[in-house]
């Protein structure tokens, strides 16, 4: 038929994840031991749809779409039920000794663990002003909070299209995601003019300096502010191709196809950094090499 597809629901339980756990006194040479104890649950819905809206003698159009809704969280990390137990991971450029993310039961892997930024009445961040969440009169590690945001997308998808008219053909492929968050570490490390002035780089301010207006030295806590946490949902047009096939050239019985293509055509996103697709698993953007856009001209000959 002209329409076909499938839908699958999945539930995957991963057990025996490695973690260091505290051992009883005298039972081991150290006070912790690496053991298989953690568990993680991954569930979601996958679907794909292919349909042919146009099919005539001269015209053919085929469209494909696939997507996955997913939810991942830890269900066990150690041998106790302590609700505040967490494994801290992932360092950033600035700050000393503090890690940006946590693995914690009930949360997705690499959930961001940040300070909450304070803003003025115009919505601009106030430098070194963070919310005293534990109400102890000072800003300390107890004021950081689990943001419930992670680099793991809630939904990711792909789309393809193929269109032909007589000897012409056109097609594209794209993909994207929604609900994935990136910590803009480059922005965090370059958010104040104080750094650039001291480095002798006055003409080369990061764009964020103009946006924040920060002029003093950042506090150790400011580097971990949730103001640098950004929704990195995106759509990327991976490639576009246009071709023409010559079925007969004079007395020659072969065929020849000429095609022009572009890869990494464009990206649609609200993320302010260079690229919303961050290599690795932790979603921390310390400034990556840009992906090149490639143009190609292809010639295929069949004898």
Show which residues each predicted segment covers:
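Membrane-embedded beta-strands that build the outer-membrane beta-barrel scaffold
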Residues: 1-11, 45-53, 61-69, 157-163, ...
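Outer membrane beta-barrel strand-and-loop segments of large Gram-negative receptors
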Residues: 6, 10-55, 116, 144-148
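Outer-membrane beta-barrel and related beta-rich outer-membrane complex signature
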Residues: 17-21, 61, 69-89, 179-207, ...
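Flexible, solvent-exposed coil segments and beta strand-coil junctions
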Residues: 21-32, 44, 134-142, 212-226, ...
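C-terminal beta-signal and terminal closure region of outer-membrane beta-barrel proteins
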Residues: 34-42, 87-113, 119-124, 198-200, ...
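Conserved small-residue
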Residues: 35-38, 52-151, 270
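Short sequence motifs at beta-strands and strand-loop junctions characteristic
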Residues: 37-43, 149-154, 221, 227-236, ...
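Extracytoplasmic gating/loop element in the C-terminal half of outer-membrane beta-barrel translocons
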Residues: 177-263
